[in-house]
């Protein structure tokens, strides 16, 4: 009898006071995470070689004895009357590491005459003329390429050794002039080096093309009506140059902080084009997706868990009963709060707080760690065995779930559609590989329950360098 009296006194005290709503921690929406968009750039070397090839003559020469050396063979100069022909093969580009090798084959003949003594009879000597085969040599040019911070190209070619395929011995004099000829060829090939550098530098002028892509990335894109994706580019990296399989490869990496938000089109923030640094060894992106569910839908799930449509869940206090008649849920950041009103032999308010859990397999939100707040505990736990036993708490933990499949799938599809499209001269590709919960937001009296999910995956692109 005494114990029952104590319980009634406690219940009376509970019904006489209204427990204030527990304050929720004030938090801002999740901060945008750093993400990476890698843009692969491949430049076939064959078209570059062909362009240079078209600008460099294939042949050069002078008919026999029409090229005068040291004034020609006649007195008083008493020099040499000469003639020659040089023909080259096509330029062939290859490479390895970060260097380009350009190879070219040469064939030539040489003929000259001199008066010995002077004046006197002409003595004629030659190499590579009929009946001999033309003489040959191989030329190689090595080109070092680098992309500078302003995305211009530094290109510098050097002539390698010119290797004779056979010797040029002037017969019948027996004079070997091969080495002198190779030195002369080196001087004559300097214009080819300059032409090669100019052509490669023009192919690698990436700044104008990347600037266009940078401007496009600054433009928000509408995922769904009223839902916008802003990429927010903030930096550029350059991938090291490599040459293999007759292609020069490099890449541009855009560092982004993508944001998905609701409302009107976000204001475009003009971001100056930055100098580039070295690309990071990363290829992932992460963006926070606000998945909005109407509060009425969430409320219906809570009502179902507590059987409110049928009058509410009833629990026993010995010979007394208490019934949950109303419930509300709101949230901010990493936690949610549930407000319960109950009536019966005792009236009162209780609050529970817990951390939402997102099951990626079922795409449901649940609240497995819901528990009464300290404000409620002081009033209820000492007076109501049903609360101590956790009947309502366990019911909510197991039955209160929010299906997120439809809004998540719709948002995921919208996002992947945007990540797989042409944006100016940038052809995007991307996929969402994983979703996990960051936080849940719904203020008291708010009409929308928003779950922020972190979408992680990969995004890459090709840029039109033509």
Please identify what each model-predicted range represents.
Residues 10:
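Conserved short S/T/G-enriched processing/targeting/catalytic segments and their helical context
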Residues 13-16:
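C-terminal motif of bacterial Sec signal peptides marking the signal peptidase cleavage site
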Residues 1-6:
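Bacterial N-terminal signal peptides that target proteins for export
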Residues 18-466:
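Extracellular/lumenal and peripheral-membrane lipid-interaction modules
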């Amino acid at each position: 009898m005494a114990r029952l009296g104590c319980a009634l006194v406690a219940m009376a005290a509970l019904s006489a006071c209204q427990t204030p709503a527990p304050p929720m921690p004030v938090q801002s929406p999740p901060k945008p995470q750093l993400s990476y968009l890698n843009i692969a750039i491949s430049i076939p070397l064959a078209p570059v070689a062909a362009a240079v090839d078209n600008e460099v003559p294939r042949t050069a020469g002078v008919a026999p004895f029409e090229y005068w050396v040291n004034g020609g063979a006649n007195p008083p100069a008493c020099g040499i009357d000469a003639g020659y022909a040089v023909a080259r093969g096509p330029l062939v580009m290859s490479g390895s590491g970060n260097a380009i090798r350009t190879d070219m084959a040469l064939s030539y003949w040489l003929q000259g005459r001199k008066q010995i003594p002077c004046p006197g009879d002409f003595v004629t000597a030659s190499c590579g003329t009929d009946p001999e085969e033309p003489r040959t040599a191989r030329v190689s040019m090595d080109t070092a390429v680098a992309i500078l911070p302003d995305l211009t190209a530094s290109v510098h070619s050097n002539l390698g050794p010119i290797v004779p395929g056979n010797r040029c011995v002037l017969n019948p004099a027996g004079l070997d002039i091969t080495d002198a000829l190779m030195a002369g060829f080196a001087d004559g090939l300097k214009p080819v080096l300059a032409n090669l550098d100019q052509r490669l530098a023009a192919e690698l002028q990436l700044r104008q093309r990347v600037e266009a892509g940078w401007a496009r990335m600054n433009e928000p894109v509408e995922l769904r009506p009223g839902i916008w994706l802003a990429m927010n580019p903030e930096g550029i990296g350059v991938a090291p140059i490599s040459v293999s399989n007759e292609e020069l490869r490099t890449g541009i990496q855009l560092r982004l902080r993508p944001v998905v938000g609701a409302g009107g089109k976000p204001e475009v923030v003009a971001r100056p084009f930055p100098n580039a640094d070295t690309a990071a060894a990363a290829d992932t992106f992460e963006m926070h997706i606000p998945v909005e569910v109407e509060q009425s839908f969430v409320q219906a799930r809570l009502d179902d868990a507590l059987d409110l449509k049928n009058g509410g869940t009833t629990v026993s206090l010995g010979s007394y009963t208490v019934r949950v008649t109303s419930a509300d849920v709101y949230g901010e950041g990493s936690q949610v709060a549930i407000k319960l009103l109950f009536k019966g032999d005792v009236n009162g308010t209780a609050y529970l707080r817990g951390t939402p859990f997102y099951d990626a397999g079922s795409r449901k939100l649940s609240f497995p760690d819901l528990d009464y707040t300290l404000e409620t505990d002081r009033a209820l736990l000492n007076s109501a065995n049903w609360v101590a036993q956790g009947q309502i708490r366990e019911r909510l933990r197991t039955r209160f779930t929010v299906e997120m499949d439809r809004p998540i799938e719709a948002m995921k599809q919208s996002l992947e559609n945007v990540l797989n499209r042409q944006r100016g001269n940038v052809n995007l590709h991307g996929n969402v590989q994983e979703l996990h919960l960051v936080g849940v937001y719904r203020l008291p009296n708010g009409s929308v329950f928003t779950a922020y999910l972190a979408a992680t995956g990969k995004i890459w692109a090709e840029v039109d360098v033509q």
